[in-house]
Amino acid sequence: MRLLYPQEIEVFYLIPAVRKEFAVQLKKQGKEQREIAKLLGVTEAAISQYLNEKRATEIKLDRIIISKIKKSTKKVKSPIDIVGEIQEILAFIRQTRLICKYHHRFMKGIPKDCYVCFGYVKSRINKDRQK
C-alpha cells in the first residue's frame, strides 16, 4: 500500500473532479467548450473528456460540493475567479473533513477515527505558541 498524503488526494483526485464539475455546470449555463477551457486553464480536449466522463472519474463529489460549485459558476468571469472559487471549495472539503472520506477511499488501512492531519497540526500550533 502506497502512502498518500491528503494533499496528494487533493492534487490527483479532488482538483480534477472539481474542475470537471465546473466544466459540467458551465456547459449547462450555455458556455462553449472553448470558453470553459480558457476559464479553467485546460485544453478543449480536457473539457471534452470531462463532459464525456473520460477524465476525473475516480471521485464522485458529494451533493453539497456540487451545490457549492453550481453557485460558484454564477460568479465566475475570469480564470482568477475560478482559482479563488476552487480554493474556497477545497478549504470547505478540509474544514468539513470530507477530505478524510476521500483519503480513506484511496488509502486502505487508515483507522476510522483518524485525526492525524488535524490533531497533529493543532497540537503543533499549540506547542509553538507556548514557546
Q: What is the predicted role of each segment?
A:
Residues E32-L39, I47:
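Short alpha-helical "recognition helix" segments of helix-turn-helix
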Residues K71-K131:
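Helix-turn-helix/homeodomain-like alpha-helical modules used for DNA recognition
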Residues T57-K74:
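Short Lys/Arg-enriched helix C-cap and helix-to-coil transition segments
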Residues V24, S48, K70-K74:
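Amphipathic alpha-helical segments within well-ordered protein domains
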Residues M1-R19:
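Short, Lys/Arg-enriched anionic-surface-contact patches
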Residues I15-G30:
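Short, amphipathic alpha-helical "recognition" segments used to contact nucleic acids or chromatin
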Residues L51-N52:
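DNA major-groove recognition helix of helix-turn-helix
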